[in-house]
Amino acid sequence: MSQQVVIFDTTLRDGEQALQASLSVKEKLQIALALERMGVDVMEVGFPVSSPGDFESVQTIARTIKNSRVCALARCVEKDIDVAAESLKVAEAFRIHTFIATSPMHIATKLRSTLDEVIERAVYMIKRARHYTDDVEFSCEDAGRTPIADLARVVEAAINAGAKTINIPDTVGYTMPFEFSNIITGLYERVPNIDQAIISVHTHDDLGLAVGNAIAAVHAGARQVEGAMNGIGERAGNCSLEEVIMAIKVRKDIMNVQTRINHNEIWRTSQTVSQICNMPIPANKAIVGTGAFAHSSGIHQDGVLKNRENYEIMTPESIGLNQVQLNLTSRSGRAAVKHRMEEMGYKETDYNMDHLYDAFLKLADKKGQVFDYDLEAIAFINKQQEEPEHFRMDYFSVQSGSSDIATASVKLACGDEIKAEAANGNGPVDAIYQAINRVTGYDVELVKYDLSAKGHGKDALGQVDIVVTYNGRRFHGVGLATDIVESSAKAMVHVLNNIWRAAEVEKELQRKAQNKENNKETV
């Protein structure tokens, strides 16, 4: 049996389903590139048949990613399979992941079918997918509640049909680790052709057992683990990939398996996902939480000072967290800033040096000293906002005092036109949002406002993340500045640009669809 565990990331498919606002194509690509740097073997990046936007995202990522295999999800439906293949065909190599429910409950109440019909349908769809690629994965949805004899029948038929990877999902997070281990062992005992496929697992955290179930399955012989960075996903989330990866590395003495992951990229990838998805990482989160390597007890602190291994089973450096932070000033040149970015693991292609250095100088003039966390924050924000902007803040002013009423004046560039407005609001942030909305004419509703500090002390940068609804859809915006009102204004301008870009994308997709129809009529 292979000692290599395939890491299958579903942050951009199962993980994204849990987000309050959908990600843009650019944001998804940014996460995909981070996952590629980290070395995931397979990344599932969308469900192409679900929407034209998802199709475009999958296609864009498939065209860009070279070192990880790109995968798309499809139900056991002909159209799903065909659309998935169409979105992926620009990739050098790709995988189609198809699935159908196998538990008695799902078959009877959801599918209104029989096990024999489910097997027949699965076999047909796997063969259809094989017309497009040799790399087909099949999932037995709700496998955790499927009798082992039924599960073995489905798995054997799927392998005979050509599936190279068989995924065993604990879809509702119901199974206990010892049960999940027995399921994997049972399949190895009952399925005669099981050596012709890789057995995969996909676990959910409804009972807090997703990682435990994944580790138990690997110990029992599974050789692919599916999950998401930071454990994001439906309901209570997916299996946290960073936890499984580090468990395999730290406990190699009993696991006897390995992954191809670049462990030095774990921290950075986790932060990228957290920031783009607007999902803060709990301080006590294993591996990547801010408290994961903190020691507050006097006894523990004394022990760590004498020997870190007394209370640390891994080091911050083992996940790419460099705790030595160099401060820069406004006198630091471009070379010094570039060198520091390289030391933190960034390549020149990860950021625009001109934009980064300009933002660095402005921040250094305000703060005096700029630290690593400042550089990372402005690099992230610049990456988020480097797309063409229709709206740009030219000027703003807010007047407020001890009363609830504040007055804001704003001047915005709207395309080639400069517009100005003023408005009152319940506090400075509300006032500036009212003024911005008057300028743009967008009737947006603020549904979430988060403020977080990037750095320490009174000079910390303030990052504002907002979620708004517009025409029934949710959009995310982010702003960063030393002033909270300025951060808030930047976040609103960013979200309005995202709304504008989404509308432009929809227009382009409609234009392409119309051209396609016109070409059909001509033929």
Swiss-Prot record:
Catalytic activity: 3-methyl-2-oxobutanoate + acetyl-CoA + H2O = (2S)-2-isopropylmalate + CoA + H(+)
Disulfide links within the chain: none
Protein's cellular compartments: Cytoplasm
Alphabetic keyword roster: Amino-acid biosynthesis, Branched-chain amino acid biosynthesis, Cytoplasm, Leucine biosynthesis, Manganese, Metal-binding, Transferase
GO cellular component: cytosol
EC number, as in UniProt: 2.3.3.13
Annotated stretches, region: Regulatory domain: 392-523
Span of domain Pyruvate carboxyltransferase: 5-267
Record-listed Mn(2+) binding positions: D14, H202, H204, N238
Database matches in InterPro entries: 2-IPM_HCS-like, 2-isopropylmalate_synth_dimer, AIPM/Hcit_synth_CS, Aldolase_TIM, LeuA/HCS_post-cat, LeuA_allosteric_dom_sf, LeuA_bact_synth, PYR_CT
GO biological process: L-leucine biosynthetic process
Pfam families: HCS_D2, HMGL-like, LeuA_dimer
PANTHER family: 2-ISOPROPYLMALATE SYNTHASE 1, CHLOROPLASTIC-RELATED, HOMOCITRATE SYNTHASE-RELATED
Membership in a protein family: Belongs to the alpha-IPM synthase/homocitrate synthase family. LeuA type 1 subfamily.
Assembly description: Homodimer.
HAMAP family listed in its UniProt record: LeuA_type1
Name this protein carries in UniProt: 2-isopropylmalate synthase
Species assigned in the record: Enterobacter sp. (strain 638)
Gene responsible for this protein: leuA
